Swiss-Prot record:
Catalysed reactions, semicolon-separated: Cleavage of Xaa-|-Asp, Xaa-|-Glu and Xaa-|-cysteic acid bonds
Protein name (Swiss-Prot/TrEMBL): Peptidyl-Asp metalloendopeptidase
The organism of origin for this protein: Xanthomonas campestris pv. campestris (strain ATCC 33913 / DSM 3586 / NCPPB 528 / LMG 568 / P 25)
Molecular function terms, GO-annotated: metal ion binding; metallopeptidase activity
Cofactor(s) required for function per UniProt: Zn(2+)
EC number: 3.4.24.33
Amino acid sequence: MKSKSMCTTVGLIAMCLAGSAAAAGKPLYQTGPALSRSAAATATAEPSLQRVLSSPSTANAQVVQIDAGAVAPAEKLLELQLDGQTITATQAKVDALEGGDSIWYGNLGPRAGTRARTLSGVDPLNSAILVRSGDTVTGTIRYAGKLYRLRPLADGRHVLVQVDEQRMPQEHPAEYSLLPKFDMPNDGRVTAAQASSGSPATIRVLVVATNQAVTAYGGNMQSLVQLAVAEANQGYVNSNVGITLQLARYETTSYAETGNFTTDLQRFRVTNDGYMDSIHTSRNTYTADVGVIVLNNSSYCGLASGIGSTAATAFASVYWDCATGYYSFAHEIGHLQSARHDAATDPSTSPFAYGHGYRYGNSWRTIMAYACPSGCPRLNYWSNPNISYNGVPMGNASTADNQRVLVNTKANIAAFR
């Protein structure tokens, strides 16, 4: 409702200004000048910043001075500088992490995309998820559909990166077409006519990052992993899946990557082969249903061990720069639950004819879908004909209902450990 006061007197003007200041968000960061790709070649550039600037998917980048204290439950509004504009992020919720760290979720813009929200209360094209760990902040920001990443550098600074999603690596190596299919027990509680998420399930994930990935990223890898888990959980909420993904354990490995996704994933998965065998002890100790290895391999975004899984095959790999914002971390776990790509890209009907991701023209796509012909943002949603985005159903009952797949396989995968 508009105010009837025009603040015409000096006193009222002062009061209005004070009220505006009180309503303004706390700045999350102060921006510096935009960086050019040529800056990556300078001898003084920090190595992880060099990699950011030389990445094909970097549309632009700038070093920022972060205020990590802004990522706190008490901060209901944050100010972000994006595209030369001051954008307000409105807090949706805050999750506490061990050690006093936190994850801050919010919506961006005036009224924060009210029309676009579904039952989750979050607009996927205008939202932010920020992970605070000490003096560092790692986050994914979407504004007007554009993808931004906020990440710490090894020298203590932070960088804000706008990502060109059309220049991200290919989804999978050619071996994807040869992946085995595993028939998972299907509890059948969700049929095409139902929108139920069934009983809730908790899936625990062990994440192992190679030292090569940690060095190449240069930031706080554990926070990046926590961000990937938070994004996965937001996607489950958005699509009424009824899964909570828990980070059972994060650790690193000195295993030397081969540069081949299939080889590295096999060595991660197989027991007693002389490669990373200790991770299986960790998996049992920390009761992790699923294992994911984070690699420094920019050839592709990731690879799962199969379409569907057993307790012995529930392992996947992901390139660190695809894990968040592009949702490859959740995407690969989706494969382990029998989810497939969009039907145009991946027409196989095994194990479920309805088990594909969804693309809506050139406007958007869901987590399991490949890029639209002319490019489109990937929304943090699983295909689901019972949920709409801006009035458009996010799937169909015959070929694009990943939610139904995940709901009907979640109890099985959650019982692997």
